[in-house]
C-alpha cells in the first residue's frame, strides 16, 4: 500500500510500498469440482493390454522391475521415433529450400566467393614457423613457517620473590614425589623387560618343541606313506602273480585240449590241404607254372609251322596235279596230228619245277584262306588217284 502522506515522505526521504493483502488460492482441486463443473474435453481411451502397469503371466510370481543398466525399450522406441521425425523434418526443409536451377547443357555450376574481400584458395595451406622459448624451471621457494594468528590478548603480571610460596619448604615434597615416580617407572620398565625376556625365552622353547613335534609328525607321515606304498606294491605284485598263474593255467589247459583235439584232426587236415594243392613241391610248382606253359607254347608254334609247311606243300602238289590234268584233257581233246606238237613242241615246258616256281606266289596267297590242312589233303589225294589213273 503506497504511503500518501507527503510530510511523512519528506521526513523519511524514502519511498515505501506495501501490497494489499489477499487470500491465496488453493492449488489443489476439490474432488467434487468435476461433478459440479463437468469437463467438456473428450476422454482419452487406452488399451490396457499394452499398459505396463498390468501384470501378465503368473500372478503368484514376484513382479520383476527393469534390470539396472539396461535402457527402457519404450524410451528407446520413443527416441527412435523422435529421431525419425527430426530426419523427416530436415528432409522436408531441404526440399523446400530454394535451389539454383540446373545448368544449361554444356555448362556447369562453379563455386565462387561472394565475400567483401577475396581470399586465395590454394591446395597447400600457408604455414608459418614460430618459435617460443620458455624459462627454465625455478626452484620451489621454501615453505614459510606456519604461524597461527593470535586469538587472545597479551597481559603481563609481575610476581616478586616469596609472594607465592617458599621454594625450600614447598619444593621438597614435590621433588620427593617426582623422584619416587621416576624410580617406580624405572622399576616397572625393568620388570617389563625381564617379563618380555622370559616370554621370549619361553616362546623360543615352545618353538623348539613345536619344531621337534612337526619333524616327528613328518617322519611318521612319511613312514605311513612308505608303508602304504609298500602295501600297494605288494598287493599289485601278488595280484600280478595270481593273474599270471591263472593265465598260465588257462594256457596250459588250452594247450592240452588243443593237442588232444588236433591229434586226430591234423593228419586229415594236412591230407586234405595236400590233396587240394596247398602244400606243394616248389620245384614241381615252378616247372608247372613256369616251364610247362613255355614248352607248350613252343610246341604249338613248332606244330603250327610244320602244319603251315605241309599245307603249302599240299597246295603246290594240288596245283601241279590240276595243271597236269588240264594238259592231258586238252591233249585228249586235240586231233591226233597236233598232239605231238603240243606235247613235244619247242615251246612246251615239261619241267615241274618251273611250273612250281611260277605258281608258288598265288599258292602262298591262298594259304591264309584255307581253313585246315585236313580239308586240303582231300583234293590232293583225289589228284593222286587221277595221276595214278
From Swiss-Prot:
Tissue specificity of this protein: Expressed in ependymal cells (at protein level).
Biased composition (Polar residues): 338-359
Segments of this protein annotated with the region Disordered: 63-106, 332-389
Keyword set, alphabetical order: Cell projection, Cilium, Coiled coil, Cytoplasm, Cytoskeleton, Flagellum, Phosphoprotein
Main location group: cytoplasm
One GO BP annotation of this record: mating
Cytoplasm listed as a keyword: yes
Compartment(s) where it occurs, according to its Swiss-Prot or TrEMBL record: Cytoplasm, Cytoskeleton, Cilium axoneme; Cytoplasm, Cytoskeleton, Flagellum axoneme
Annotated Basic residues bias: 81-90
Phosphothreonine found at: 143
Subunit description: Component of the axonemal radial spoke 1 (RS1) and 2 (RS2) complexes, at least composed of spoke head proteins RSPH1, RSPH3B, RSPH9 and the cilia-specific component RSPH4A or sperm-specific component RSPH6A, spoke stalk proteins RSPH14, DNAJB13, DYDC1, ROPN1L and NME5, and the RS1 complex-specific anchor protein IQUB. Interacts with IQUB. Interacts with phosphorylated MAPK1. Interacts with MEK1. Interacts with PKA regulatory subunits PRKAR1A and PRKAR1B. Interacts with RSPH1. Interacts with RSPH4A. Interacts with RSPH6A. Interacts with RSPH9. Interacts with LRRC23.
Protein family: Belongs to the flagellar radial spoke RSP3 family.
Protein name: Radial spoke head protein 3 homolog B
Species whose genome carries this gene: Mus musculus (Mouse)
Amino acid at each position: 500500500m503506497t504511503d500518501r502522506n507527503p510530510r511523512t515522505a519528506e521526513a523519511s526521504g524514502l519511498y515505501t510500498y506495501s501490497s494489499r493483502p489477499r487470500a491465496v488460492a488453493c492449488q489443489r482441486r476439490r474432488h467434487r469440482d468435476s461433478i459440479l463443473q463437468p469437463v467438456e474435453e473428450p476422454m482419452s481411451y487406452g488399451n490396457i493390454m499394452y499398459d505396463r502397469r498390468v501384470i501378465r503371466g503368473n500372478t503368484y510370481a514376484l513382479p520383476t522391475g527393469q534390470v539396472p543398466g539396461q535402457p527402457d525399450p519404450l524410451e528407446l522406441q520413443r527416441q527412435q521415433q523422435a529421431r525419425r521425425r527430426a530426419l523427416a523434418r530436415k528432409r522436408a526443409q531441404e526440399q523446400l529450400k530454394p535451389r539454383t536451377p540446373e545448368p544449361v547443357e554444356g555448362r556447369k555450376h562453379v563455386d565462387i566467393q561472394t565475400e567483401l574481400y577475396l581470399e586465395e584458395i590454394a591446395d597447400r595451406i600457408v604455414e608459418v614457423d614460430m618459435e617460443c622459448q620458455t624459462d627454465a624451471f625455478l626452484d620451489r621457494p621454501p615453505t614459510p613457517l606456519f604461524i597461527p594468528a593470535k586469538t587472545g590478548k597479551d597481559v603481563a603480571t609481575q610476581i616478586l620473590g616469596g609472594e607465592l610460596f617458599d621454594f625450600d619448604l614447598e619444593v621438597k615434597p614435590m621433588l620427593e614425589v617426582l623422584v619416587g615416580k621416576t624410580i617406580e617407572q624405572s622399576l616397572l620398565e625393568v620388570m617389563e623387560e625381564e617379563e618380555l625376556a622370559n616370554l621370549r625365552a619361553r616362546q623360543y622353547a615352545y618353538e623348539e618343541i613345536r619344531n621337534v613335534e612337526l619333524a616327528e609328525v613328518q617322519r611318521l607321515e612319511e613312514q605311513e606313506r612308505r608303508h602304504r606304498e609298500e602295501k600297494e606294491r605288494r598287493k599289485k605284485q601278488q595280484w600280478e602273480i595270481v593273474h599270471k598263474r591263472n593265465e598260465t593255467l588257462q594256457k596250459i589247459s588250452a594247450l592240452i585240449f588243443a593237442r588232444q583235439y588236433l591229434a586226430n584232426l591234423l593228419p586229415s587236415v594236412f591230407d586234405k590241404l595236400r590233396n587240394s594243392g596247398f602244400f606243394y613241391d616248389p620245384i614241381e610248382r615252378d616247372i608247372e607254372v613256369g616251364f610247362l606253359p613255355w614248352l607248350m607254347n613252343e610246341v604249338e608254334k613248332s606244330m603250327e609251322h610244320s602244319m603251315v609247311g605241309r599245307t603249302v606243300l599240299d597246295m603246290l602238289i594240288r596245283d601241279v596235279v590240276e595243271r597236269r590234268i588240264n594238259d592231258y584233257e586238252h591233249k585228249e581233246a586235240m586231233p591226233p596230228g597236233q598232239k605231238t606238237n603240243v606235247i613235244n613242241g619247242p615251246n612246251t615246258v615239261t619241267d615241274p619245277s618251273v611250273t612250281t616256281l611260277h605258281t608258288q606266289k598265288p599258292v602262298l596267297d591262298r594259304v591264309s584262306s584255307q581253313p585246315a590242312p585236313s580239308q586240303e589233303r582231300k583234293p590232293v589225294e583225289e589228284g593222286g588217284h587221277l595221276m595214278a589213273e
